[in-house]
Each structure stands twice: as structure tokens, then as C-alpha cells.
Amino acid sequence: MLPTLFHKWHALELRELLPNYATITAMNKYADQVKQVVKDLYGVDINAELTRPEAKFGDYATNVALRLAGQLKRPPRDIANEIKQKLDQSGQFDEVTIAGPGFINLTVSAKELDGDLERAFQAKIPYGENRDGRGRVVVLDFPSTNTAKPFSVGHMRSANQGWAARNLMLATGWKAISDNHLGDYGSPFGIWVVGFRMFSDEEKLAKRGIYELGDIYIKTKQAIKEEQAKGEHRIEEQAQDWLLRIERGDPEAVAYSDKFNQISLDHIHAVMKRLGVSTDYEIGERSLAKLGKEEVARLVKEGVAEQNKDGSVIIRLDDYGIETPLLVLKSNGAPLYATNDLATLAFREREFKADRAIYVVASEQKFYFAQLFAAAKKIGYDAELIHMWYGLVDQINEDGVREKMSSRKGVVLLEELLDEAEKRARANAKSEGISDEDIHRIALGAIKFTDFSADRRTGMLFNWDRMFNLTGYSGPYVQYAAVRINKILHDNKAGKPDPDYDYRAEKQVILKLLDYPSVVKQAADYLEPHRIATYIYELAKEMNRYYETTPVATKDVPAGVKAARLGLLRRVAYVFEHALKILGIDIPERM
């Protein structure tokens, strides 16, 4: 059973009774020993940070002698030799060597490292997790879909990255509240009403649903563009009038808005279910429209915002290094994104007591969020505000050039992408009779792992062949490694491990497992889920190397050795499942 980080956020109330343990890793343990030796030798209190060198140099390395050289005014290699002698005397290390100008390399016995791993797994906190965020609340804003539009590939990245960020926050002790802040208000709704009356009818809407609404929007925007070319604005003015009618609560206008929103929500829920993503709340812009205008009026009254002669309202941000003021209300009194976002900030601070808010939105909005966050500081909001931005979804075109992903019709719809992924997953299946559920897991794993295969800021390169490559950096490659382990564990009963087994054959696997808590911490601290993907791929490669040299459960393996190796595999299986769950990827039963 997986730890409760995958339950709804309110389930964490029970776990908050746990003490706020620091993450205890083998690296910390050996770093503390080096730190104590330095203190004993020189009376200096210094953090002896350890890193993982290439395996040929040892298990851990430290530059503490180089850092002490200036303070002690002595050659770093002499200091390193003195530290080495003390560490040798401790009997803790198999080997201590010095490299270069004074780097100290430490080699630990595999059996000692396995003991470290066993103790870490027995801790009260699930392995890989910590309590850095204990007692604090974070609100994650994703995927923030627009209603009356089909779910596009563009919103897929927000959903995937946001879900992983939410899981990372839970894994590091935060109470995480997720909100799909629906774009269910604003000028597009006026456009849909006018467009529906111009280009569609109830029969078409009932038959095609969200896709009819998408076409209506495109046709109406084109009609507005053609009118503007003639110097006319009739359709645009009608759309604005319908928006104001919705705002005033006009029954006919509200009926249109409710109808379009319900069609949209049904579609959004269906697609998010296929994507394996959900949120705790769906607080739409429309529900906060009144609060938004009230906030603007309050800010004008308090002198934080100022009203221009044309009636528009701005917040000046020069004191925060931003020359362009934030426009928070149009001259005709119509709201903007900023109007609603300020209301949302006020709502979340009041209702959720949020200490942090993470907005998972594409890089195109970087300047806007810089403005919004500066305005929030000026207003006096206390929450830490983070724009977790990501690059676009790209593809390689027929000329071999990387470009923004699109179809002949323009926007690539996520449902079509998921359908194609499942078709390819079935075609690439290695076994007969794989269930539809497993096909879906493989397809989704391929897409999501690609999303996390590089730093979110670099963009996502979409390539079908790479996505389903069973020998490369892909979701199916990692899933297959996990399936293989699960099958070995399923086919072999656990026994009593040989107490004298030295774990030399498993040492690199153990070291990789010991890295996991620090990888989770770094991924959470920097909001970089790709660190989890990189780690789990490296673990899969390490396991494949291990299988090549070490039989796990063949008949010629002694029972005690077999039990010891199966015990290690159970820990590997746990880490695979835990890490993939953070990314929102499920392990198939068969592939």
C-alpha cells in the first residue's frame, strides 16, 4: 500500500501529528562523521557536504579540506591527509582516498549501506518523504481551463506539471489544495452568445457539444476580424453587451452562460479523468466577479490603485522595477484577468489561509505574473507567490525544424492525442491480451514521461517514436522495468535473508535507492518534477545492469541469498511506484 501522500489533502490531518523529522539519509550520516572529525581536529564547525562521484572514485566525496585551507592557512592536501587518518581510525569506511588538490573520497561497505537503507525504510515517515512543509498550506492553480473550449494539448502541460507539483508538496509535508480556476467569465462569453445566435442552434449544440462551441468561437472571431477590417464593430459591441448582461444577472444571458459552462465542465471532467488528474476545487472566475470589482474599488479608495480620466483603473508598479502599470479595470467597467486574479488572491488568503500559491501557467504569461505578484506585494498579501512556468509543446516538422505543435486545423485536441497514444500503445505491446486498462496506463505513461523528460522550462518535444521506445528514455522503458520487478516478486515467495550476505553485487542499486529522499526534496524545493523522471530512469538502467550480472531467483541461488535479493527488490518496487505516482504514472500489470 502506498503512503497517504496520494490521498486528498485533508487526509493529511492525521499525519500532521507526526513529529517534524528531518530527512535522514546515509549521506547525512557520513557527512556528520566528517564534520565531527573536522571539529575534533581543528575546532571548526563546518558543514561537510558530500556528493556522489563516479563509482570508480568511491561512494561519497567531500571538498571540506579545500574549504578549510583558507581558514587554516594550510595546504588543502595536508588537511585532507589528517582527516583521512582520523576517518581510517574510525573503522566506518572500507577505504578513504585523496584525489587532486585535496578531495576526500569515501567508500562504505555494501552491507553497511544496506543497513542504512533498512533503517530509513523503517522510519515513521514513508521513505522518500519529509516534513519540510509541515503546518503550512499551499494552493496550486492548475490546469485553469477555459470553459466553452475543447481541452487542448496546451492545457495538458499545466495539468501534468501541476499534478506532480501537488504530489511533491504532499510528499514534503505541505497541506496541498488544488484549484482548477475555471475561465468561465469575461469577453469570450459574449462572443459565444453572439456566435451561437449567428452560426449555430440547439440541435447542433446537443449533437457536437464542446466541439460546436469551439467552432462557434473561431467563426465569430473571424467575423469580428472581417468587420474590423471594414472599420465596423457591430459584433464586438453585441458581444460586450451580452457580457454586461451576464454580469447584471439578466436571465437570458445567465441561461446561455450556464448552458455553455455545463457542456464545458462535462468535457473537462471527462478529459481530466482520462489524464488521471483531479483538483479539490473548481472556483471559476464568474463566482468571484463581484468580489473582483469590490477589491478594485477598495484599492482605489485606499490609494493603492488609481482611476484614470477614461474610467480605467491601474496599479502603478514603478517601486517594484516594473514600468508598465497593471490594468485592473477597463474604461467601460468591464473586468480583466487581473481583476479576477486579485479577487482570487483575497479569497484564497481568507478561506484557505494559504502560505504559498503556485500558478502552473505557460511561459507566455511571465510578464503578467511579474506584474500581478508585484501588485500583490503592494496591496499587502503575505502569501509566497510562485509562477511555475513551462515551455510550449513542440514537434519536429517535415523539414526537420522544431516548432510549436499544431494540426492543420490549428489547436491539437488532447482527446485526439490520447486516442492516438492508446492506438500506438496497443500496436507496440509485447504481450497478447493486454487489458484496456493497461493499454491506457502505457499510453498515458508515454505522454506524461515525455512531459517530465526535461526541465519544464525547456518545453516538451513531442515525438511518437521516442515516446514508445522500450530501450530509451521513455515512460514505457521505466514502466517495463517496474513490471519486471513486480513479476519477480509475484512469482517468488519471501524467505529469511542470509544474515551474512554482503550485498556487494547490489551496492550500486542500494546507493541509487539511498539517493531518492534527496531527489524528492530537490524536486519539491525547485518545483522541478523532471528530477524524479531522470532519477527513475537511472534506477531502471541500474536494475537492468544488475540483472545482467546477478541472478535473483534462479534455482542455483541459495535460499538466504535469494531472500536478501528479493528484499532489496521490494524496496526498488516501492521506489518505482512512489516516484511514478508523483508524476501521475501508473504501473501496468502486463506489457
What would you call each of these model-derived segments?
Residues 23-114, 125-591:
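Non-catalytic interaction-recognition regions
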